[in-house]
Amino acid sequence: MSDVSGDGDLSATVTEHEVTPQPPVSSATYPSLTVSASYKESSGGKSSSKRRPIRPSFDAAADNEFITLLHGSDPVKVELNRLENEVRDKDRELGEANAEIKALRLSERQREKAVEELTEELTKLDEKLKLTESILESKNLEIKKINEEKKASMAAQFAAEATLRRVHAAQKDDDMPPIEAILAPLEAELKLARSEIGKLQEDNRALDRLTKSKEAALLEAERTVEAAMAKAAMVDDLQNKNQELMKQIEICQEENKILDRMHRQKVAEVEKLTQTVRELEEAVLAGGAAANAVRDYQRKFQEMNEERKTLDRELARAKVTANRVATVVANEWKDGNDKVMPVKQWLEERRFLQGEMQQLRDKLAITDRAAKSEAQLKEKFQLRLKVLEETLRGTSSSATRNTPEARSMSNGPSRRQSLGGAENLQKFTSNGALSKKAPASQMRHSLSINSTSVLKNAKGTSKSFDGGTRSVDRGKALLNGPGNYSFNKATDDSKEAESGNGWKENSEEKPQSEDPEAATEDSVPGVLYDLLQKEVVSLRKASNEKDQSLKDKDDAIEMLAKKVETLTKAMEVEAKKMRREVAAMEKEVAAMRVEKDQDARAKRFSNSKSPSNTAQILAGRAAGRSGGLTKSTQ
């Protein structure tokens, strides 16, 4: 983008690959200015080459530092790029969170399957417990039968002793057969009964041991059942907690969707604002071209006024010299006492000297006002620079880290161009101050126009990384198209004004007609810049709040994942304990089965022996009875 400076020279345009300086309009020599276009990021993804700016030589280093503070990359686009990167990171984090949620769901399904297997094992253990209880009941019945048999054997023993007593009593009374013959079978029966009683006592002891072991096994089984019930309750609690966590995750996802919608709305609003800013920049550039043309005309007009004033002065001097020559010629024939300057000549010389003194006073007043206005503008610029430094400190630091070379190559010439524009405008004010009848209001308007034009140049040169070349192309189009049109139009208007009204009317009417337009053009960018600054601050706050909410959600997800991990570990430990208990129960059941088989075999063996013993006892009893009968018959 090439701008027309206040003194009439065109600054050189620097594109991506070549530098095309344009010739100056006037014959005066001024330092050539350059504008460096920033690196553009094209849609095809091509990387732009390095630019070769032409660096002008300035003497004042303080002015360079002052203008370098005015320049900077576009904060809105940098902030938008940063927000888009953050949104992508958050989307990536959401994808990871969804993957973790899927993994947690799979782990929950596996836990449910494990719980179902444990419930099946518990049902099997309950069935085994019922079987053991039925076996214990059968054993108790057998123990009762054995006790009854024991009581019957004791009763038989008491009956045998009673018979022995009777036999002894009968021997005393009557002559009986020998007692040994009668007692031998009875003693044999007693021995058999005692042996059976000992076996039954051993069986009772073994059954007592079995009952105690069964009771201990039942107690352990009850404990395992209680533990399994507690685990089932824990599993239910875990399922409820998992459902609550799933609900919370869904709520967080809905909140994320709402935040994404809000972010999209903010991005759309920022895009609209950037579009309006671009349109306003285009309008400002168009107004700048027209303003440059108007400044050229004003400068030419002031030069012509100065020439007219010099001609008037020369005419007055010529008149004075002519009058003096006339007086000298007239006084040649007079005496020394009669040689007196005429009153008309003295009045003209006095008027001429008073006019020159008034011009000098006007110049002093104008320079004082210009110095005061420049001091005020400097204070305003310093305040604006402080605000810009505070707002753009974070974004500019990130941007300078990424592209320090691009910043160093693109900032210097553009800032120097804005500095050159300010110097040219100051020269313009100093040249314009030479006019004789310029009022204080016109000087104030011109100073305000010059200050705002400095800001325009600074804003125009501060191109962003994306739209730098676009602004260059727009500046070229504006200078080639509407700039020439406004220039020609201004020349036609000036010719008509000169033909109609003359020098004084043009000098008074042109600034009055151009001041409100310049004021309106200059007041718009500041308001829009403040609005954009407020929007950037609000977007930063929203992004910070969103980051904080996402961090809280990530912390909650991490806590939930830790809880799930601890629960899974507890479930694994409990499953291992259950497996160990089930293995121990199976071993005990196998041992009980072996003992039961041994008991059944022992019972079968005892049952096979008992018929033979009873047959022997009955045979002995029958023989004793037959012997007694024979003795009684004898």
Swiss-Prot record:
Q: Where is the composition biased (Polar residues)?
A: 25-35, 393-417, 443-464, 605-616
Q: Which InterPro entries match?
A: MAP70
Q: Which residues form a coiled coil?
A: 74-392, 532-601
Q: What is its main location?
A: cytoplasm
GO MF entry, a single one: microtubule binding
Q: Which UniProt keywords apply?
A: Coiled coil, Cytoplasm, Cytoskeleton, Microtubule
The UniProt annotation puts the region (Required for targeting to microtubules) at 258-494
- Can you cite an annotated GO cellular component? cytoplasm
The UniProt annotation puts the region (Disordered) at 1-57, 393-526, 594-634
List the Pfam families hit by this protein, alphabetically. MAP70
Q: Which Gene Ontology BP terms does the record give?
A: cytoskeleton organization
Kindly list the places in or outside the cell where this protein is found, as annotated in its UniProt entry: Cytoplasm, Cytoskeleton
Domain of life according to the entry: Eukaryota
Provide ranges: composition bias, Low complexity: 36-47
Q: What's its job?
A: Plant-specific protein that interact with microtubules.
Q: Which family does it belong to?
A: Belongs to the MAP70 family.
- What this protein is called in its record is Microtubule-associated protein 70-2
